[in-house]
Amino acid sequence: MIEPRTLKGFRDLLPAQALAREKILDIARRIYRSYGFAPIDTPALEYLEILTGKGSAETDKQLYSFTDHGDRRVGMRFDLTVPFARFAAQHIATLGTPFKRYHMATVWRGENTQRGRYREFMQCDFDTIGTTSPVADLETVLVVHDLLVAIGIKRFTIRVNDRRILGGVLRSAGLAERSTDVLRSLDKLGKQSLDAVVDEMAGHGVPADVARRLVAMAALAGPPAEVLAAVEPLVGDDAVGREGIAAVRTLLDGVAQAGVAEGRVVVDPSIARGLDYYTGIVLESFLDELPTLGSICSGGRYDDLAGLYTKQRLPGVGASLGIDRLLAGLEELGRLATAETPAEVFLVHFDAAHLGDYLRIAAALRADGMTVEFFPEARRLGQQLKLAAKKGFRVALVIGTDVFARGTAQLKNLATEATTTIAWEGDLAALVDAVHSHLEAIRSDH
């Protein structure tokens, strides 16, 4: 007999987890659409050269790649941004610019597993391609803000930076040739100790005193205006770096004008993003109560990525919700719904002789927009109610043989165990209205 098991970093989702994920996906879809983003899809498998064109040595090591039956080198997508750049280059003549898309799909990375990090996970991306307008950068931050609010997260922080600022600091320090390695090292702040990051930079040829200054800069915190003022001297006269500072100031002004609460969006000079394709604004979002969980929604501007696949310039900006990490965080905080069913009403199967009546009642409740599960067997009442409570139904509707004769029904609130008698006297519409009203009252209490 084969032992049922899953690979390390891969997992099954039980109903409660899958339902919680679907709920967040529905919210993300609604928020993305409210800003005009349209859905697309791309293959899970791409030519390997598509995926490795603008990654990094670290990303390449994490790729699941192989030679297929046609002797082609192929790989599983490690994110949704690179396939989108290929997609845009291939279809831009049809799409037009600027083009706004969202994409929710599974990706694969052969990385070390840890809390909230898996080798197979889902990303929920949205991107705008074909414009360098700072409005697109601003909108990206606003979508992230609105999404986290809609999910019901009350305490979160969006941390922003600009890769041009970091580049300017490095050029002013004479480290332009080592910028890629230094940025990757800075991206590990918060995941590794300050000394470990300094040592790693030293391994890339950065003098220890310069490495400490860079780490000190990355650790700056406080009001955005003060952080930018402290970074400005480090950028010096570097024109591109000053463009980055101006871009962050413009972004913060827009965030304030859009009505985002003060303190929700802060400047964090350590935010670099590990992927090499980012060129401008970058952002990461954190649960304030679980800062060590890592970013739950990240992204930024990538103006050159599509240039790997087309001569047409297609600058882009976007972000991705890491739904699996977010779910892990919500579960740790005890804020994840535990219901194992999408249905709210459990219709008890009390008497097989009334099967037709039960089916008509269930159909009428569903036609009214309610979600209903009818138990398939006429088991003992206590047994059915115990199962209904375990699975997380809101109410159980009990109509027995004698109850059919009297024209009444029992509606049991499975959370409080309170029971309400409904006098419907064979009027199906009256029964539906009564159940609907009770459900609305229960929902409003939650």
Please name every model-derived segment.
Residues 12, 169-176:
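Phosphate-rich ligand and nucleic-acid binding surfaces
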Residues 17-35, 46-47, 70-71, 80-94, ...:
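Positively charged, Gly/Ser-enriched RNA/tRNA-binding surfaces
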Residues 61-70, 175-196, 287-289:
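Acidic, His- and aromatic-enriched active-site or binding-groove loops in soluble protein domains
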Residues 118-124, 160-168:
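Short, conserved phosphate-binding/catalytic loop or strand-edge motifs used
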Residues 40, 44-74, 117:
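Polyanion/phosphate-binding surface patch
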Residues 1-18:
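Auxiliary tRNA-acceptor-end handling modules of aminoacyl-tRNA synthetases
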Residues 155-164, 182-183, 265-270:
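Short, surface-exposed recognition loops or helix-turn segments adjacent to catalytic cores
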